[in-house]
Design a protein with these regions (language model features):
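Bacterial N-terminal signal peptides that target proteins for export
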Residues: 1-7
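Hydrophobic h-region of N-terminal signal peptides that target proteins for export
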Residues: 10-19
Length: 325
C-alpha cells in the first residue's frame, strides 16, 4: 500500500512538473479604433480552437478588448458588448461650455470654438489635457465593466485573472509606458487616448496618450511577460515596409517633429509583426477607426471570425504544442 501511495505521489509530482514546463501562450491585440470589433471575431475562433491564453498585451482598442478579456469577459460577452453599444453617445462627451466664445483661455489651454488648439505654461494650476473629447463616458463605462467583471462574481470562481499589460505614450518624455492590471479602467483609457481626439491621462508626472504612437502591436511586451508562443491580431492595413525616415535631417528639432521624422511606431511595428508565431491580419480595408455604426461593427466581427478561421490549423497547432510537453 505504501509503495502504491508513493508511486501515485511521484506521478502527481511529475505531472505538475510537466504542466509547469508547458509553453506559455501570449495574445497580442493591436490598435485600430472601431476595427477592434474584428479582434472579438478572432477571439471566437481562438476559443473554438481550445487555446488557453496565459498572457495578454494590447494597445488602444486592443487594450480595451484585452483588458476586459483578462478579467473574465469572453468572446460572446464582448460580441454582445460591441453590438449593443451606442458608440456615438459613448464617445461624444465634448465639453461644449467652451463654445460660448470664439477664443477662450482656461487653465493654460487656448480654445478655438471650444476645441483646444494651444497650451500655454500653466502657473499655479493643473493644466488640462488636449483632446476634443473628455473621455469621461468611456472611462465610466470601462470602470463599470471592470467592477462587475466575471472574475469577481461568486459563481465564476473557476476564472482566473490573466496577466495583462497595455501600452501608452508619454508625450512629455516621448517614451513608451507599460501599464499593468492596477487601475485597469484608467490604464485602458490612457492607452486609447488618441492625441487631439481624447483628453490625455495624467499619471504621476506623465501625460499619457494612445500607445499606438510608439507600439501598436506589442509582441515584444508579451514576450517579456513570459510568453513563448505569441498569437498577434493586427488591425493595420498599410504596412510601410520600406520606411526609411526620409526627413531624418529634421530630427534635431526634437519633440513631436522628431517623432514625426523617425516614426518609431512604424519601426517597432515592423519588428514586432515578424516575431509573432501566429499572425492574424483581418482584411479591414473598407473600414476605418471611426466605423462604429452597427452594420460595420457586425461586419467586422464576422471578418475577424473568418480571419481566425483561416488560421484554425495554426491555432490548433498552438494547442497541441501546449499539450505535447
Amino acid at each position: 500500500m505504501k509503495l502504491k501511495t508513493f508511486i501515485t505521489l511521484l506521478f502527481i509530482a511529475a505531472s505538475l512538473s510537466v504542466w509547469g514546463q508547458r509553453p506559455k501562450i501570449g495574445l497580442v491585440l493591436g490598435g485600430g479604433g472601431a476595427k477592434g470589433a474584428a479582434e472579438v471575431g478572432v477571439l471566437h475562433e481562438i476559443e473554438r480552437a481550445g487555446v488557453h491564453i496565459d498572457y495578454i498585451a494590447g494597445t488602444s482598442i486592443g487594450a480595451i478588448v484585452g483588458g476586459l478579456y483578462s478579467v473574465g469577459y469572453r468572446a460572446a460577452d464582448l460580441d454582445t458588448l460591441f453590438r449593443s453599444q451606442n458608440w456615438l453617445t459613448l464617445l461624444s462627451d465634448r465639453d461644449t461650455t467652451h463654445c460660448k466664445k470664439i477664443v477662450r483661455e482656461e487653465d493654460g489651454v487656448t480654445y478655438l470654438f471650444g476645441f483646444p488648439v494651444r497650451r500655454t505654461k500653466a502657473v499655479g494650476k493643473k493644466a488640462k489635457g488636449f483632446g476634443l473629447l473628455r473621455g469621461d463616458n468611456v472611462y465610466n463605462f470601462l470602470d463599470s465593466l471592470v467592477a462587475n467583471a466575471p472574475i469577481y462574481r461568486q459563481r465564476n470562481t473557476h476564472l482566473q485573472r490573466i496577466p495583462f499589460r497595455c501600452v501608452a505614450f508619454d508625450v512629455r518624455r516621448q517614451n513608451e509606458v507599460i501599464l499593468t492590471e492596477d487601475s485597469l479602467a484608467r490604464n485602458m483609457r490612457a492607452s486609447m487616448a488618441i492625441p487631439g481626439g481624447f483628453k490625455s491621462v495624467s499619471i504621476d508626472s506623465m501625460t499619457l496618450v494612445d500607445g499606438g504612437m510608439i507600439n501598436n502591436l506589442p509582441v515584444d511586451i508579451v514576450r517579456a511577460m513570459g510568453a513563448e508562443i505569441v498569437i498577434a491580431v493586427d488591425l493595420t492595413q498599410t504596412k510601410h515596409d520600406d520606411f526609411d525616415a526620409p526627413l531624418s535631417f529634421l530630427r534635431g528639432l526634437g519633440g513631436f517633429i522628431k517623432w514625426l521624422v523617425e516614426r518609431p511606431d512604424i519601426v517597432r511595428y515592423n519588428e514586432n509583426r515578424k516575431q509573432a508565431d501566429v499572425y492574424i491580419n483581418p482584411n479591414l480595408k473598407d473600414y476605418g477607426v471611426t466605423s462604429f455604426n452597427p452594420n460595420a461593427i457586425a461586419d467586422m466581427i464576422e471578418i475577424g471570425k473568418k480571419a481566425g478561421e483561416a488560421q484554425r490549423e495554426a491555432l490548433k497547432g498552438v494547442k497541441l504544442k501546449k499539450q505535447a510537453l
